[in-house]
Curated annotation (Swiss-Prot):
The record marks S373 as: Required for activity. One of its GO terms (cellular component) is mitochondrial inner membrane. This is ATP synthase subunit alpha, mitochondrial. It is found in: Mitochondrion; Mitochondrion inner membrane. Keywords: ATP synthesis, ATP-binding, CF(1), Hydrogen ion transport, Ion transport, Membrane, Mitochondrion, Mitochondrion inner membrane, Nucleotide-binding, Transport. ATP binds at G171, D172, R173, Q174, T175, G176, K177, T178. The keyword Mitochondrion applies. Gene3D superfamilies: 2.40.30.20, ATP synthase alpha/beta chain, C-terminal domain (1.20.150.20), P-loop containing nucleotide triphosphate hydrolases (3.40.50.300). It comes from the Eukaryota. It holds the Pfam family ATP-synt_ab. Mitochondrial membrane ATP synthase (F(1)F(0) ATP synthase or Complex V) produces ATP from ADP in the presence of a proton gradient across the membrane which is generated by electron transport complexes of the respiratory chain. F-type ATPases consist of two structural domains, F(1) - containing the extramembraneous catalytic core, and F(0) - containing the membrane proton channel, linked together by a central stalk and a peripheral stalk. During catalysis, ATP synthesis in the catalytic domain of F(1) is coupled via a rotary mechanism of the central stalk subunits to proton translocation. Belongs to the ATPase alpha/beta chains family. GO terms for molecular function: ADP binding; ATP binding; proton-transporting ATP synthase activity, rotational mechanism.
Length: 507
């Protein structure tokens, strides 16, 4: 049997086949592992790779390209390198490292790549942001002018912090650095409850770098019990995580905080602590065969921290008026603030809160050294009433410290010196505060006003804490709120009478 095929039919058939033929090309640039060890893989063949690009190994482990050399690419591995062998294929992803950001992150605990580790499932609606971005320029910024209350009397009165500021918390191990940071997060609970709009709310990001997992779990428990997780994000790169993740975690947390800053909201980010990030970066740099410098840190360790902390800023009204406040933590060795990393970060930040072991063991907690602690821009953001009340506080404490050193040797002191010692001891007592008990600003104003104006001068030192509790529990709410307006002229009459009456009962 013969089949006759007409040319027109054949043409139509071929045309329809060609029209419906889709080819979906996917071009992958593939490299091969030349050597691997100590969390570093040398890869040959990735000629077009970008610095900081994410790559994927055949085993599924990811890494980031940091060294682009003539012969090969130095890649730091996010995870265990035991599953990577010489000759394995490595694929470019084409994307620079990014993390999820947005309000969906609030209340969650994530790792340095933004993957949830709290066992509460995947993240809901969110956007993705690059971890490394340029800091806002000069024109996009505005001077710091809004207060960021920590709830700690010693900080809010003597070293006030403003929204958009970078204030370093520095001290030896076990001096209460993390306690100040946590108290600041807890204090935002009452501040946010008073907020009338989204622009007044302050969201918190806590980045734990190189800490024990048990410590991070304890922190999560403290925040959840205080209902503070609802406005907080926790980024954890624990001690058991690879060095690249500890290096990356602060940038990831910063990208999450920048979401709020760039959308007209306010955020606070705590880096606890940047000493461990510098150590992780030193480890990576030495393994990548980069030349070491002072204390074996690489030459760009200053840039490591400056590019991170410059991203904390107060935005101008034209760019949304949002802010990102940074509280970096640095651990010193035996109180040496002149070491390499501490001096670097002190020079980058807008002030520092210095904590001392000696004060901590003497029971002065928070153990803030008032003489060394400073806030370079915060006073512009301090409440007017607080500024009036604590104007003489720093001077009196400085004079007290000076005289107290000599008073140990001589017993025959004149009346003025004895009065100064007496007042200084009481001011020091008033600035003490238990952990996880932040005070609203109006209560701080009342307590400091009482101490500065001599209501505690004739009172035994052990009665001062009781006096503080008494006045805070019995003062009328209207009178307390009126303190924010300042304590001058006629406004002083009612508080003075109230404080005097309470003081007389304890003398």
């Amino acid at each position: 049997m013969e089949f006759s095929v007409r040319a027109a039919e054949l043409t139509t058939l071929l045309e329809s086949r060609i029209t419906n033929f889709y080819t979906n090309f996917q071009v992958d640039e593939i490299g091969r592992v030349v050597s691997v060890g100590d969390g570093i893989a040398r890869v040959y063949g990735l000629n077009e790779i970008q610095a900081g690009e994410l790559v994927e190994f055949a085993s599924g482990v990811k890494g980031i390209a940091l060294n682009l050399e003539n012969e090969n690419v130095g890649i730091v591995v996010f995870g265990s390198d035991t599953s990577i062998k010489e000759g394995d294929l490595v694929k470019r992803t084409g994307s620079i490292v990014d993390v999820p950001a947005g309000k969906a992150m609030l209340g969650r605990v994530v790792d340095a790549l933004g993957v949830p580790i709290d066992g509460r499932g995947a993240l809901s609606d969110h956007e993705r942001r690059r971890v490394e971005v340029k800091a806002p320029g000069i024109i996009e910024r505005k001077s710091v002018h809004e207060p960021m209350q920590t709830g700690l009397k010693a900080v809010d009165s003597l070293v006030p912090i403003g929204r958009g500021q970078r204030e370093l918390i520095i001290g030896d191990r076990q001096t209460g650095k993390t306690a100040i940071a946590i108290d600041t997060i807890l204090n935002q609970k009452q501040m946010n409850s008073r907020a009338t709009s989204e622009s007044e709310t302050l969201y918190c990001v806590y980045v734990a770098i190189g800490q024990k997992r048990s410590t991070v779990a304890q922190l999560v428990q403290i925040l959840s019990e205080a209902n503070a997780l609802e406005y907080s994000i926790l980024v954890a790169a624990t001690a058991s995580d690879p060095a690249p993740l500890q290096f990356l975690a602060p940038y990831s947390g910063c990208a999450m905080g920048e979401y709020f800053r760039d959308n007209g909201m306010h955020a606070l980010i705590i880096y606890d602590d940047l000493s461990k990030q510098a150590v992780a970066y030193r480890q990576m740099s030495l393994l990548l065969r980069r030349p070491p410098g002072r204390e074996a840190f690489p030459g760009d360790v200053f840039y490591l921290h400056s590019r991170l902390l410059e991203r904390a800023a107060k935005r101008s009204d034209q760019t949304g008026a949002g802010s990102l406040t940074a509280l970096p933590v640095i651990e010193t060795q035996a109180g040496d603030v002149s070491a390499y990393i501490p001096t670097n970060v002190i020079s980058i930040t807008d002030g520092q809160i210095c904590l001392e072991t000696e004060l901590f063991y003497r029971g002065i907690r928070p153990a803030i050294n008032v003489g060394l602690s400073v806030s370079r821009v915060g006073s512009a953001a301090q409440l007017k009433a607080m500024k009036q009340v604590c104007g003489s506080l720093k001077l009196e404490l400085a004079q007290y410290r000076e005289v107290a050193a000599f008073a140990q040797f001589g017993s025959d002191l004149d009346a003025a010196t004895q009065a100064l010692l007496n007042r200084g001891a009481r001011l020091t007592e008033v600035l003490k505060q238990p952990q996880y008990a932040p005070l609203p600003i109006e209560k701080q104003i009342l307590v400091i006003y009482a101490a500065v104006n001599g209501f505690c001068d004739r009172m035994p030192l052990d009665k001062i804490a009781q006096y503080e509790r008494d006045i805070l529990s019995t003062i009328k709410q209207e009178l307390l709120q009126s303190l924010k307006g300042g304590l001058t002229g006629e406004r002083k009459i009612e508080p003075d009478a109230f404080l005097k009456e309470k003081a007389l009962s304890l003398i």
